[in-house]
């Protein structure tokens, strides 16, 4: 039974060792010397790359505008939702408020005496 647990580990480790032995180390100096030659682009490739980047930026800007419009429309829908006043709902609302407020509440936060010793029956000393 123990062999079945270790067999995938053994297979993976054997494959990793095989890959490590089959690869040869390349000096860092040769990589650095050859990189400027590999990064040269022709003028046509530069124009194509610039056009692709510009199209991507325009697409992202349109997506952000659509999301903002949907959020503006969605805010009226959330106002019509039925309110929930159970302890779980109130706790979730307070947690959401705290997470949205960020550092404002954290700067003014004063820790209270909370924990196993704070509420209910306390442990008695065994010395008595």
Curated annotation (Swiss-Prot):
Region forming the signal peptide: 1-25
**Prosegment location in residue numbers:** 26-80, 125-128
Q: Keyword Disulfide bond: yes or no? A: yes
Q: Which cysteines are joined by disulfide bonds?
A: 84-89
Q: In which tissues is it expressed?
A: Detected in nerve cells of cerebrum, hippocampus and pons/midbrain in newborns, and only in nerve cells of pons/midbrain in adult.
Keyword Signal among UniProt keywords: yes
List, alphabetically, the PANTHER family matched.
CALCITONIN GENE-RELATED PEPTIDE 2, CALCITONIN-RELATED
What is the protein's given name? Answer: Calcitonin gene-related peptide 1
Q: Which organism is it from?
A: Mus musculus
Lineage, broadest ranks? Eukaryota, Metazoa, Chordata, Craniata, Vertebrata
């Amino acid at each position: 039974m123990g062999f079945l647990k270790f067999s995938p580990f053994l297979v993976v480790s054997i494959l990793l060792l095989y890959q490590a032995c089959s690869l040869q180390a390349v000096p860092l100096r040769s990589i650095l010397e050859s990189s400027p030659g590999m990064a040269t682009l022709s003028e046509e490739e530069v124009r194509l790359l610039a056009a692709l980047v510009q199209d991507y930026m325009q697409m992202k800007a349109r997506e952000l505008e659509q999301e903002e419009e949907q959020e503006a429309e969605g805010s009226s829908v959330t106002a019509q939702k039925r309110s929930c006043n159970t302890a779980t709902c109130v706790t979730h609302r307070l947690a959401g408020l705290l997470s949205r407020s960020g550092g404002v509440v954290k700067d003014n936060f004063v820790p209270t005496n909370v924990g196993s010793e704070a509420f209910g029956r306390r442990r008695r000393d065994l010395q008595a």
